[in-house]
UniProtKB/Swiss-Prot annotation:
Organism, scientific name: Homo sapiens
Assembly description: May interact with EIF4A1, EIF4A2 and EIF4A3. Interacts with PPP1CA and PPP1CC.
Ranges of Acidic residues composition bias in the record: 249-267, 278-293, 312-325
Motif range (Required for efficient binding to PPP1CA and for targeting PPP1CA to the nucleolus): 307-310
Protein name, as recorded: Nucleolar MIF4G domain-containing protein 1
Length: 860
């Protein structure tokens, strides 16, 4: 025990402390006085240190001495160089290492006993307090005499020097143990860094270049989560473990690096680092002593078991690392994208600038609307067009719509003239800028009206919105379909508020509706009369219902005087201004929105199909859903015979089948006309009505005038149907020689009927080359003109032929008709007809010829 205590005093806490004090006080000894006593003491100390160093270099531990023969603290008289201090430190570490490795083999000898006692004294403080055990932070020892230090060092050297063979065997075992410890440490570090799967070609592990380049090859272990993170709690333990197991060359290089780092600090920091190192070495000596006491065979089995456990730990670490990767990927996938601060700041700057720009735009537009009037309509509309060119369409549409809604939709009733001027501005921009302007404003107005109508309002917002919709129709932004949809919904509910709104709408657009679609207005009036007669007893005040019915009757009879307060002059005046401003607009003539009430309200689900290029997603196409609905309705209501007949007639699309079944199941041509319009077809789909109608007419075995009257109704309804019929008839003209007899005869009667009813003009014959007529075309023209002349009244006949007399482009047609009438129609008239019929034909042919020559010849 005395030997171990002396070893503890000569360890890092004792000898190194004395070295530090030598560095502090070494230069002060020779200066104490002129006497030579200090120099003699210094020489004796040097001799004692040299003997002690020689003894430790031969393999003896300073703590292995019996008694207290180890060198104790002394006060040197001179300063040693740094090289000598590093050399002494290396020798001390080697001696302690040899003592630990050789201790188990010596059994209960002196050296092993001292190491074991020192370890047990470190673990059990209570047993060792009776003895002066080595402290981790030793206090400055008492000054011994130089002669006593020298004697104790000599005695320790003589008593504890081991043999050369034992020293070599102990050194070999220490190297093997150090190699195994180093392998375990490397595997431990690899598991902690997650690098156990990365292997070089020679089998050794490697750190990724990115880790080494960024300095993460060392600090990455401290960031790892899990139980392995505790392996790197103390950098001192890391260094001490490496110092215990590395070879001598590595140990020397490490000690040199440490000494170089110590040179940079002051002496106090050096002392604290050495004391901490000594403390960690004492802790590790306990583990090494316990492992050294086991037998070689048991140690090998234990190593095998550890290898197995290491393999299991590697698998667990691999699984945990894979789970961590999956978790990190899921977090990265579900989390938001990281935005760097400079990008975030740039976005905030852009948003702030955008907000300021929108505020300026809003003020500018609002200022223009505040100055709006009829005289400056042209200048304000021009400035708004420039704003549309300078800003995005979306920003301008939103800003203009919000400004107009704020100006027109108020709690009090707006003046009619002011309302019309604002809507006229929208109409001008709708025609000059694009239809999305009017479409955006219309959608906002309809949605606002629907919300206020459902939830009610005490003010006049609902009336103002209804007036805006009426004037949008007056100034040709929307067609009559939207107005009729609204009126039908109001008649369906038929409350006092509904009656008031119906009267307001009829007062503003009643006669325009009658002009555009008299049939729909007639049906609406009939439905309103039926509803009023059924719900008359529910209203206490019958005067409002009576006034509404009188207004509808006045519209039906086209009597403006019976509508109180009706003045069409302001609307007509603003319409003239509109025509003057949009005359040179390049947006085309078909700018009116043919959209229904339900389509506007369901625009978010079905898309804004009335705006060219509008984006939409999330629901099936509107046409497909509409066709599916029609197909379901068709299967449920139409017999299988009609469907089979449609298949035979080559109605190969849903639209054609629906049109065919509608025509076949109608009561008369008026019923068919109404049902076909209610199909809600658009553009190309509407043309299919004419194509199906022509096919059905020509496929009849005998001529059926039902198709001719239905065709006349469509031609009177809108001009686009006239153009479709004209092109369809021209297609048949080119293929006359291939038509069967029944188809040929039905086509003759259809064309003659359309000419007699003035649904089509004689200009449809302008494609006929009268100079190159073949037999089918001569026969076709002879029959058509004979029916036209014989079955038409004189007044109607003169109008039919006069329509083509004043057009200079139809000169060839006029000359060809006169030549055909004189040579092909009248030449053999008496041979095929009776005398009376021939005379009537000749008289009407002369009248037709005079009409073709012009109005002057007709007067003569």
């Amino acid at each position: 025990m005395a030997a171990s205590r002396s070893a503890g005093e000569a360890g890092p806490g004792g000898s190194q402390g004395r070295v530090v004090r030598m560095k502090r006080r070494g230069g002060r000894g020779p200066r104490r006085g002129p006497a030579g006593g200090g120099e003699k003491a210094l020489k004796r100390l040097k001799l004692a240190v040299e003997e002690f160093v020689h003894a430790t270099s031969e393999g003896e531990a300073p703590g292995g001495c019996e008694g207290r023969g180890a060198p104790v603290s002394f006060r040197p008289g001179g300063r040693k160089s740094r090289k000598e201090l590093r050399k002494e430190k290396r020798h001390l570490r080697k001696a302690r290492r040899l003592q630990r490795t050789a201790g188990p083999e010596q059994g209960p000898g002196l050296g092993g006993r001292s190491g074991a006692e020192e370890a047990s004294g470190h673990r059990q403080d209570t047993e060792e307090r009776a003895r002066p055990a080595p402290s981790r932070d030793p206090s400055p020892p008492r000054k011994p005499r130089p002669s006593r230090v020298k004697a104790k060092a000599t005695a320790a050297t003589a008593k504890t020097r081991p043999s050369a063979a034992a020293t070599a065997a102990a050194r070999k075992r220490a190297l093997l143990a150090a190699n195994e410890e180093e392998d375990r440490e490397i595997r431990k570090l690899e598991r902690c860094l997650g690098l156990n799967k990365r292997k070089k070609k020679d089998g050794s592990s490697s750190v990724p270049l990115s880790f080494a380049r960024d300095g993460l090859d060392y600090i990455l272990g401290a960031l790892e989560s899990g139980k392995n993170s505790g392996l790197y709690d103390s950098s001192g333990e890391e260094e001490e473990d490496a110092g215990q197991t590395l070879p001598e060359s590595d140990l020397e290089s490490d000690s040199q690096d440490e000494s170089e780092e110590e040179e940079e600090g002051d002496v106090e920091k050096e002392k604290k680092a050495q004391e901490a190192e000594a403390q960690s070495e004492d802790d590790d000596e306990d583990t090494e002593e316990e492992q050294g006491e086991e037998k070689e065979k048991g140690a090998q089995e234990k190593r095998r078991g550890k290898r197995v456990r290491f393999a299991e730990d590697e698998e667990k670490s691999e699984n945990s690392s894979e789970d961590g990767d999956i978790t990190d990927k899921s977090l990265c996938g579900s989390g938001e994208k990281y935005i760097p601060p400079h990008v975030r700041q740039a976005e905030e700057t852009v948003d702030f600038k955008k907000k300021e720009e929108l505020e300026r735009l809003k003020k500018h537009v609002k200022g223009l609307l505040n100055r709006l009037s009829e005289p400056n309509m042209a200048s304000i509309s021009g400035q708004l067009e420039e704003l549309y060119m300078a800003h995005s369409r979306k920003d301008m549409n939103d800003t203009l719509t919000s400004a107009l809604m704020g100006a027109c939709v108020t709690a009090s009733a707006m003046p009619s003239r002011l309302m019309m001027e604002h809507v006229l501005l929208v109409s001008i921009l709708h025609h000059t800028v694009g239809i999305e302007v009017g479409a955006h404003f219309l959608e906002a107005v309809v949605r606002k009206f629907d919300a206020i109508y459902k939830y009610g309002s005490e003010g006049k917002e609902c009336d103002n919105l209804f007036t805006v919709i009426a004037h949008l129709y007056n100034f040709h932004v929307v067609q009559s379909l939207l107005i009729f949809d609204i009126l039908k919904k109001l008649i369906g509910t038929f409350t006092e508020k509904d009656i008031e709104l119906i009267l307001l709408m009829l007062k503003n657009v009643g006669f325009s509706l009658r002009k555009d679609d008299a049939l729909s207005l007639k049906e609406l009036i009939t439905e309103a009369q039926t509803k009023a007669s059924g719900a008359g007893s529910e209203f206490q005040d019958q005067t409002r219902i009576r006034f509404m019915l009188e207004t509808m009757l006045a519209l039906k009879n086209n009597d403006m005087r019976k509508i109180p307060g009706y003045d069409p002059e302001p609307v007509e005046k603003l319409r003239k201004l509109q025509r003057a401003l949009v005359r040179n607009a390049g947006s085309g003539s078909e700018t009116q929105l043919r959209v229904s009430w339900d389509s506007v309200l369901s625009a978010e689900q079905t898309g804004r199909w009335w705006i060219v290029g509008s984006a939409w997603s999330g629901a099936p196409m509107i046409d497909n859903s509409h066709h599916t609905h029609l197909q379901k309705q068709l299967v449920g209501t139409v017999s299988s015979k009609i469907l089979e007949l449609a298949r035979k007639q080559r109605m190969n699309t849903d639209i054609r089948r629906n049109i065919f079944c509608t025509i076949m199941t109608s009561e008369d041509f008026l019923d068919a006309f109404e049902k076909l319009l209610k199909l809600g077809l658009k553009d190309q789909q509407e043309r299919e009505i004419i194509h199906v109608l022509m096919d059905c007419c020509l496929q009849e075995k005998t001529y059926n005038p039902f198709y001719a009257f239905l065709a006349s109704k469509f031609c009177e309804y809108e001009r686009r149907f006239q153009m479709t019929f004209q092109f369809s008839i021209w297609d048949k003209f080119r293929d006359l020689e291939n038509l069967p007899a029944t188809n040929f005869s039905n086509l003759v009667h259809l064309v003659a009927h359309l000419l007699k009813t003035k649904s089509l003009s004689l200009s449809i014959l302008k494609v006929v080359e009268f100079s190159e007529l073949d037999k089918p075309r001569v026969r076709f023209l002879r029959k058509v003109l004979s029916i036209l002349l014989m079955e038409t009244e004189v007044e109607d006949l003169s109008l039919i032929f006069t329509r083509v007399s004043d057009n200079p482009k139809l000169g060839v047609l006029r000359e060809g008709l006169k030549l055909f009438i004189s040579h092909f129609l009248l030449k053999n008239a008496q041979a095929h007809r009776s005398a009376d019929e021939a005379n009537v034909l000749r008289e009407k042919a002369d009248l037709a010829t005079k009409c073709l020559q012009g109005k002057a010849s007709l007067r003569m």
